Amino acid sequence: MRILPEPRGSVPCLLLLVSVLLSATLSLARVVEVVGYAESKIKTPHAFSGLRVTIDCKVNKGHFVTKGSGNIDDKGKFGLNIPHDIVSDNGALKEECYAQLHSAAGTPCPAHDGLESTKIVFLSKSGDKHILGLKQNLKFSPEICVSKFFWPMPKLPPFKGFDHPFPLPPPLELPPFLKKPCPPKYSPPVEVPPPVPVYEPPPKKEIPPPVPVYDPPPKKEVPPPVPVYKPPPKVELPPPIPKKPCPPKPPKIEHPPPVPVYKPPPKIEKPPPVPVYKPPPKIEHPPPVPVHKLPKKPCPPKKVDPPPVPVHKPPTKKPCPPKKVDPPPVPVHKPPPKIVIPPPKIEHPPPVPVYKPPPKIEHPPIYIPPIVKKPCPPPVPIYKPPVVIPKKPCPPPVPVYKPPVVVIPKKPCPPLPQLPPLPKFPPLPPKYIHHPKFGKWPPLPPHP
C-alpha cells in the first residue's frame, strides 16, 4: 500500500459508511462494525459505481494480507466479511489493519492524508458487539480513483465515405526469392560413454501369512435320556350304593375377610459382599440306574348284592338331592429334575508379566576438578643434510608427421537473379484533404 501525493485540482470526497459483519462460526460469536465518514461535494451515485474497499492487515516483515473486500453501493455503503481472529475478546485488534479504496480498474487509490488516516481503531463495546472505526475521514479524488465509464463508444466513421475519399493503391506483389541450398554439414560421430548402471536392491519376497491352526470345538457331554413313566391303567369301579338322605345342614354365614394391615417392609441391612470363591471341580458320577417296580395285580371284583326292594312310604320330608361324587384325582407325574452338567473349564495360560525398567535415580552432579598437566619442554631439533636424488634427462619427443591437407577447389556460385523493376506508384495524396464542410483540417485518427 503506497501513499501517493494529492494531484492538483482534484475534487475529493465521498461519504463512506463501512459496516463489517463477523461470521459466528465458533461458539463465541462477536459482531465487528467499522464506521467511517468521508467529505465530498459530489452527491451523484455514479461516482461510487465500480469502487471497491478492502481491509488489509499488516503481518510480520511489513507485508499486508487482505482480510476482506466489498463493493460500494449507490449510497456509499458496503459490507465486508472478515475473520474473527484479528479481534481479541476485549475488542482490541491483534494486527494493524487499514481500509484501502480500489478504482473500477482494480488499482488502489492513493491515501490523501497518509496511511495513518485509514487505520482501523477500537471505538466502543456494547455487550457482545464491538464497534471499530477509522482515525480520520476517507478521501479520494475522482480524477485518480476513476469509477465506471458510462458514455457509449463513438461510432466511427460517422457516415459512409468519411474515412477514405480515394481508393487505396493495389498491394505490391514481389517475385519469390529462391535461395540456393547449402551442402549438408557432416560432423564426426561423438562417442557417448555408456550410461552408468544403476544397481537396485533385489525386491523383497513377500512371505505369505502363517496358516491359522483351528482346534476342533470341545465335545459336550450329553446327559442320559430321561425315562418316561406311564401312568397305571384305570380300574373301573362299580356304581356307588345310594345312601340315606341326610338332613339339610344349616347355612353357613360367610363373614367378610378381615382388612389386611400393610406395614412397610423392614429395612434389611445387607452384609458386605461375600468374596466369590470358585468351588472345587466336581466329580461327575454316572446317573443312578432307575428301578422299575412291577405293577400290582388288580383285586377281584367284589360281589354286589342285589338292591333291596324299596318300600314306598308316604314322604314325610323332601328327599335331599344326591351328592355329586367327584372322580378320583388324576395323578400328576412330574418329570425327574434335569441334571445340569457344568461346561468344562478352560484353563488359560498365566498372563505374561510386563517388566518395566527401574526408575532412574537422578544423582546430583559431582564436580571433578580438571587435571592440569605440566608443559613438556620443546624437543631438541635434529638437523639432517638434504638428500639429493639425481634426475635422468627426458628423451626428446618423437616427431609426428601429418600428411598435408588437400584443398578441394569450390565451383563459383552463379550470379544472383536480378529483380524486375518496381512498378510506378501513384502520386501520394496531399497532406491535408480538401473537404467542402470542414475545410483543410487534418484527418482524424482512427478510434481504437
UniProtKB/Swiss-Prot annotation:
Biased composition (Pro residues): 240-290, 306-319, 327-345
Top-level taxon: Eukaryota
Main location: secreted
Start-end of each Sequence repeat: 152-156, 157-161, 165-169, 170-174, 175-179, 183-187, 188-193, 194-198, 201-205, 208-212, 216-220, 222-226, 227-231, 232-236, 238-242, 245-249, 250-254, 256-259, 260-264, 265-270, 271-278, 279-284, 286-294, 295-299, 300-304, 306-311, 314-320, 321-327, 328-334, 335-341, 342-348, 349-356, 357-363, 364-368, 369-374, 378-384, 385-389, 390-394, 395-402, 403-407, 409-413, 414-419, 420-424, 425-429, 430-434, 442-446
Stretches the record annotates as Disordered: 240-345
Residues of the signal peptide: 1-29
UniProt note on tissues of expression: Mostly expressed in aerial organs, particularly in expanding leaves, stems, flowers, and siliques. Also present in stipules.
Location of this chain's protein in the cell: Secreted, Cell wall
Keywords: Cell wall, Repeat, Secreted, Signal
Transmembrane segments: none
Region feature (46 X 5 AA approximate repeats): 152-446
Pfam families linked to this entry: Pollen_Ole_e_1
Gene Ontology cellular component terms for the protein in this record: extracellular region
Similarity comment text for this entry: Belongs to the plant proline-rich protein superfamily.
Protein name, entry field: Proline-rich protein 4
Organism taxonomic ancestry: Eukaryota, Viridiplantae, Streptophyta, Embryophyta, Tracheophyta
Gene: PRP4
